[in-house]
Amino acid sequence: MRSVLACERELAELRFTWRLIETTAKMVCPAEAKTILPAMASTREAFGRLETELVRALAAENVNKVVLQMRARAQAVVDVVVRNLYERTADVGFLATDDDIRGFLRANANGRERLEARLHEYIRKYSVYDAIFVLDLRGEVRAAIGVSPESTAGDPSLLERALAAPGYVEHFGRCALLPERERALVYARRIDDTDGRALGVLCLSFRFDDEMAGIFRTFRRPRDRAVMLLLDADGHVIASSDPDHVPLGRTPEGATGADGALIDFGGREYIACTCEATGYQGYAGPGWRGHVMVPAESAFREEAVALQGAGARSSGLNCSELATIEAQAGAIKDALNRVVWNGQVMAGGRRGDSLKLKSMLQQISETGERMRAVFSRALAALSDTIMSSTLQDLQFVSRLMMDVMDRNLYERANDCRWWALAPALREALASGRGGSSLGTFLDDINRLYTVYDRLFVYGADGRIVASSSLSGAADDTIGRQVDGRAVDAVNRLASTQSYAVSPFEASPLHRDAPTYIYHAAIRAPGDDTRVVGGIGIVFESAREFRAMLSELLPARDGVWAAFCERDGRVVASTRQDLEPGSRLDLGELAAGLDAGASRHALIDFDGVRHMAGVALSAGYREYKTTGDYRNDLVAVVALALPEASAAARDTDAGLGEIEGGVRPGEGEEFAVFRLDDRHLAVSAGQVLEAADIDRVRRIGSGEGLVAGVLPLDDAGGLEHVPVVNLRVFFDLPRADGRGHVVVTHSARGRLGLLVDDLISVTECGPNDIRPVPEMVAGRFRWLDRLIITGRDRPLVSALDLDALYDMLRDQVRGELSDADCMLQDEVLSA
C-alpha cells in the first residue's frame, strides 16, 4: 500500500513540526505564546488522533477494496456453476420422459441408430453436454452419443442409485461410462413408462472442464495474478484458472470464509476468499465453493481508475467513516484558524516579543497549510479508493448480470429448436392436424418450463393451430395469425440448428406486453428440408429478467439495474419508473463497447450524478457467437451519488490572507472574517477572541437571530455573552458548515458574532480605508467603513459595532438582556 505509507510518512513529519513549533514558542516568546499554547496542544492532540484514524481508514479501505473484488469473483464462480447445473437437473428430468426413448426401451428391438440420431440433435442444441447414455435395467448401454460405438459397459453403482432415487442423481468423479476420464459430472434419471414402470436410466455428461474454463475466462481481469478455484465439499480443488500454479486435488489451507484471510500456499503468502453457493430456485448445488487467491505482494497494486476529476468527488459518497474523518479534519482546520487568528489579534499593534509571536504564527499558518494539503490528499485518496472500489464492483456486477442473461437465453434458443423436433408436432402439422392433443402436449411442457408464458404451434401459413393454456385464453389464441415477419423468418430457416427471435416489442400473445418470442421451424417427418410450420415460445420476460437483476443486485441503498438495448430502450429494470419499453438515456456509456466488454463511468441519469457499470452481451457458447442471432443488449448497474454532506467540506480552503498596503505598525488593524460570499471586519482592538461554536449554549431552537449565549470568564466573573446569527440578520440562507464565534466588545457591551470562516488580521493604511458613501450610509447603519484590499481582491465591509448592537437590540426586543433567563443546557449544533 504505497499510498498509505506515503501518507503516514507525511503525517509523521507534520507531527514532528508541530512539536518543534510549540517548543520554539515556549523558548522565544513564552509570555505571549502562553495564551495560545493550550489551544495548539489541543489541536496537536486532535491531529494525532485523526492521523491514526486516517491511516487506519486508508489501510482498511484498501483491504476492503481487494476483498470486495475477490469476494465478488469467488461468489460468481460458484453461483454461475450452480445456476447452470440447476438447468441440467431440469434437462435430465424432461428428457427422461421423451416418448422416443421410452418407445425404444419398451420395444427392446432395433432402432438404436434412429434414437442416436435424435440424441445427436439434442446434443447439438444443448452443447453443454458431451455424451448421452441410455441404459436398460441391466445397466447395459442401449444407445449412446459422444463416445465410441463399441462402448457398452455401464456403471452398476450409478444405475443402482438412479433406479432407487425419486428424482435426479448428480455424480462427480470417476464413472465407468467414461473410463478414459479422471472425473466426470453426470446427471442420471430413471426412465419410467407412462404407467410408472421403470424402463431404464438416462445419463447426461456435462462438459465440466470446458464450462469452468469459460467461467474463468469471463471473470479474468487484465494483468490478473489472482487464481480462481472451485472447491468441492471437502475443500479439494476441482477446477483452477491456473492449474500449473494451483493444481487439481490440492487443498488450500484457511479456505473458510468470505471476509478474506491471509494464508500460506507453496511458500508464499496469499489473501484468500471463499464463498458458499447462494443456491438457485431451491437447488443448493453439490456443496461446492468458490475460492480466489491473490499473492499478498501484488494484491494492493495501484490501479488507475478514471474518476473524471473534481466531478467525482464533489458529490461525495454515502460513507459514514469518510464523512466522520472529513468532519474531524474540518474541526482541526477551524481550531487552527482560531489559534492563528487569536494570536494575530493578541499580537496586533505591539512590538518586541509580539513580533516574534507573529513570526511563530506565520510558521503555524504555513504548517497548517501543509497539514491541510496532506489531509486533502489523504481524504481524496480515501474517497478515490471507496469510489474506485464501488465503480469496479458495479462494473463486475453488470458483467455478471449480462453473463447470466446470455446463459438464460441460450436455454431458450435450445428449447424451441428441440421441441420443434418432437415427432408429435412434426406428424400433426405434416398431416394438417391440430386440436386438443397438441394443446395437451404443449401444456405438459409448459408445466415443467414455467419461464414461458405460452407455447404455440402454427402452420406454414402462420395460423396458430395449438397453444398451451396455462396462462389462459388458449381458445382465443387458436386461429390467430402470427406476425408475418416471424413466419417469413421461420420459413427461411436453413436447418434444425436455426432459430428466429422476435424484436423486443408488445405482443397480443403476451397480454400486449413487450417480450421476446423464440421461433423454430417444424419440419416434415423424414424430410428436414420441408418446413410445415413453426413453434413459438413466449418468454416471461418481465418476471424473469427482473428476477435476474434483483438476485444479483448489490445489497446497498440506492443501487438499481437495467437491461437495455444499445439505444437505451429498457428491456427490464429494478426501478418502478423504468418500465419495459421506456427509454434510459445512456449517453456515451455503452458507445464503442465490443461484445463481452464492460466499463465503469460517472454519468448523469435524470439530472442526478451516478456511478455506473455497463457490460455488453457476449453470448454463450454458440448462442450469439456464430452469426446465428444478433441483439446487442447491455446491463447497467448504477448508484446515485448523494449530495455532499455538511461534513464533506473543502479542506483545501486554507486561512486566507488579505494584505493591506502599509508597513507594519503604521496603519490600523482589522480582524477580517467571511459570511457567505461577503468579507466583513471589525477593528482588531474590539475583538476579544474567536471561540469554538461548541461553547455556545442555545436559546430556543438556536436558529433565530439570537443563536444563544457564550459563557465567558474574566476578572469580573462568569458572563454570558449574547451570540447573534449574522446570516439571519443579513437574511442569508442557513450555512452547511460549523462556523466560529467572533467575541467583540464596544461601548454598548459585549457581543458574539456567528460567522462562517476566519480570514486574517490585516493592517491597513489611510489609502486602504474609505468612508461609507453618503447615499447608502443611512440605509446601512451597521456599516462603518470600506476597506480596499487591492485590484481583483474582495471589498471588506467594516462593521460599526455600536450601531449593530442598537439595531440588534431593537430587532430582538429585549432578548439580549433576557438571555441568561432563557439559557438551555443544549449545545448549538451547526
Task: Please report, for each region that a protein language model flagged, where it lies by residue.
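Solvent-exposed, extracytoplasmic
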Residues: 112-126, 201-259, 296-319, 435-449, ...
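Extracellular/periplasmic juxtamembrane segments that couple receptor/chemosensory ectodomains to their
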Residues: 1-61, 250-389, 585-656
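Flexible, small-/acidic-enriched active-site or ligand-binding loops
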Residues: 688-711, 757-792
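DNA polymerase processivity clamps
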Residues: 669, 698, 704-707, 722-750
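Extracytoplasmic/periplasmic ligand-binding sensor regions of membrane-associated signaling proteins
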Residues: 116-117, 121-205, 210-213, 259-273, ...
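Extracytoplasmic/periplasmic sensory segments of membrane signal-transduction proteins
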Residues: 15-167, 348-495, 549-552
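Mixed-charge, glycine-accented linear interaction segment located at domain edges/termini
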Residues: 769-770, 774-830
